Amino acid sequence: MKPLVIGETYRTQGRTIGEGDVSLFAGLVGDFTPIHVDETFAATSPHGTRIAHGPLSMSMAIGMATLTGLFGARVIGLVNINWDFGGVVKLGDTIRAEVTVEALRPSSKPGRAVATYGLRVFNQTGAEIQAGRMVVVVRAD
């Protein structure tokens, strides 16, 4: 594993959110809120169409960050997550993320450290739509 470097930023590839993603997520978590699954209802909303669940796009951003090799085998467990949903993700939108190593400190347990990651999520126009922080227990490098 490449050592974590405070201030280093990783950029993910993009991923387009589709019908299957929203349907599967709704079924998995049991959230069938009309704004996500009912186009007729959603057409009358301020968004004019259905939007993806906020936690779906957050989870996809974290998953895309995992594909950079930043997390993987080094992760022991999630301590905390704090997330802001500043914009919506419509079906057909493509999101990407940037992840920055913000802090790294030793854990009280040998061989472990506590890493803080800042994440920013952007849509296909480059607008920031979500941002958050994750605190994760990791294997010490």
Each model region followed by its residue ranges:
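Short, surface-exposed, polar/charged, turn-prone segments marking secondary-structure boundaries
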Residues: 31-32, 38-43, 63-64, 79, ...
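Hydrophobic beta-strand-centered segment that forms part of the acyl-chain substrate-binding groove
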Residues: 43-52, 56-102
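A generic structural signal for short beta-strands and their flanking turns/coil linkers
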Residues: 6-8, 13, 21, 31, ...
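Catalytic strand-loop segment that frames the active site of acyl-thioester-processing enzymes
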Residues: 1-52, 138-140
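HotDog/MaoC-like acyl-thioester-processing domains
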Residues: 1-6, 85-141
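Aromatic-residue detector
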Residues: 2-4, 17-22, 51, 60, ...
